[in-house]
Structure formats: structure tokens, C-alpha cells
A protein has these predicted regions:
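Bacterial Sec-dependent N-terminal signal peptides
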Residues: 1-21
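Cell wall/extracellular polymer interaction/catalysis modules
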Residues: 21-192, 202-240
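Residues that recognize and position ribonucleotide moieties
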Residues: 195
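Conserved "landmark" site that anchors the functional core of diverse proteins
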Residues: 198
């Protein structure tokens, strides 16, 4: 009985944390796929209003990991099962994740109309995907610290995919093997785990973001979205 009580308390606490994250968010991106193995998705944007969530007029067709989705490590309760994201599995993370409202890009300055802070990528910018590194799942400048990794993305050379890059906070505790370097970026083709879209759609997304408003990404197969919508207090998808 004590074990059951502790488990129920844990579940209530984790659900409460998830609800707090979505409750404190003022903007949410919802990316839904047909199933776990689909590598395309539909992306909806929602703004919080006094009457609840209001869907933005734009709906985007996007690409995700070429092998589909796997449960990631975000602000949602821990999930297990057949589909769990690991390093190098070519799956995008499923769940709820904070979105870092800092834009990286290949140009010298942000596009017109973008409010969030901008940081140009350099030829030394790396995202470390070596799980044995002390800076695993981190973006660093290679000349700013002692190199202890054997594998990293050379972000300043990834053109045109990294023309614009937003960081999805998957695996923020940087647990080895749980996945690294998950972004939203340009070029709408299936990826190694990121969410990608056409330039025009990416610009619309970037101009919609507000640095003063907390933003989260919810990324799930459609059936899972419907299953969790009430529990996680998610917006209703009017077209589904």
C-alpha cells in the first residue's frame, strides 16, 4: 500500500509539473504526426488569451526525424515503451519541451521583424553530440574551452539548413545517450532528429515569437495528443 501511495504521489507531482509548464506558457507550438514512424508533421501555433488558447492563422507542413518520433526528455512526465529517443536514432523527441527564444543563424543580423535575440553562427560554433564529453548537448565556441569531444556539429558550415536555428530543450540535464542538438531549422526534409520547415514558414514562426512570452513545443503522434490533451491541458486542434 505504501509503495502504491508513493507511486500515486509521484504521478500527481509530475502531472502537476507538466500542467504548470503549459499553464505558465503564453505561446505553444503543436507538432503532430500521423503515427510514431511518420517523418512529416503538421505544426500549429497557439497564443494564450483570456478565453484560452487561440490558434494562429498559420498552419505549417514540416519534417521531423527520418525515423519518426521517440519519447524525449522535456518538461513532461517520464515516458517509456517501444519508442524512446536515444542518441543517433534519427528520431525527433516526443513530449513537451521549452523552446529557447534565442535565434542562431548564418547571417550577420536577424531578419526584419524578428523580436527575439540573435546570435550569428561562426566557423567555430559547435553543438557537441559526443555523450562522453563534459559539454554534451551544448552549443559552444571551439576556441573557448579545452576540447574533450570526438564528435560535434560544425554549425557554421551547415548551409542552408542552419540559415535560422532555434534550440529545442530536449535532454536539458544532458544525460548521456538521451539525445542532443535538437533544433527547429530551415530546409523542409526529414532530419536526424530536428524539426525542419520551408524558409517562408520559418520566418513567419520567428516573427510570431516574443522574447517576453514563455514558449513551449508539444510534439506527439496525433493519437497520443488526443490521449494526453486533457491531462496536459493542451490546446484543442479544431481540425482533428
Amino acid at each position: 500500500m505504501r509503495t502504491i501511495s508513493v507511486y500515486l504521489l509521484f504521478m500527481l507531482l509530475t502531472i502537476g509539473i507538466t500542467n504548470a509548464q503549459i499553464s505558465s506558457a503564453q505561446k505553444v507550438l503543436v507538432s503532430v504526426t500521423d503515427d510514431w514512424n511518420s517523418n512529416t508533421a503538421t505544426l500549429y501555433l497557439f497564443d494564450k488569451t483570456g478565453d484560452g488558447w487561440k490558434k494562429h492563422r498559420s498552419v505549417f507542413s514540416v519534417s521531423i526525424g527520418r525515423n519518426g518520433l521517440g519519447w524525449g526528455e522535456g518538461v513532461h512526465p517520464h515516458q517509456s515503451g517501444e519508442y524512446v529517443k536515444t542518441e543517433g536514432d534519427n528520431r525527433s523527441p516526443a513530449g513537451m519541451f521549452e523552446l529557447d527564444t534565442l535565434l542562431y543563424g548564418l547571417g550577420e543580423k536577424a531578419p526584419d521583424g524578428v523580436q527575439i535575440p540573435y546570435l550569428p553562427l561562426t566557423k567555430l560554433t559547435r553543438c557537441v553530440d559526443d555523450e562522453n564529453s563534459s559539454v554534451y548537448n551544448s552549443i559552444v565556441e571551439e576556441d573557448s574551452l579545452k576540447k574533450d569531444w570526438h564528435s560535434a556539429e560544425r554549425m557554421g558550415y551547415v548551409d542552408p539548413d542552419y540559415k535560422y536555428v532555434l534550440v529545442v530543450k530536449n535532454n536539458p540535464l544532458r544525460q548521456p545517450g538521451k539525445g542532443s542538438c535538437i533544433f527547429i531549422h530551415t530546409v523542409n526534409v526529414p532530419t536526424s532528429g530536428c524539426t525542419s520547415m520551408d524558409d517562408e514558414d520559418m520566418l513567419a514562426l520567428l516573427r510570431w515569437l516574443d522574447p517576453k512570452k514563455k514558449t513551449v513545443l508539444v510534439q506527439l503522434p496525433l493519437d497520443e495528443y488526443h490521449r494526453l490533451r486533457s491531462e496536459w491541458n493542451l490546446p484543442k486542434l479544431l481540425n482533428n
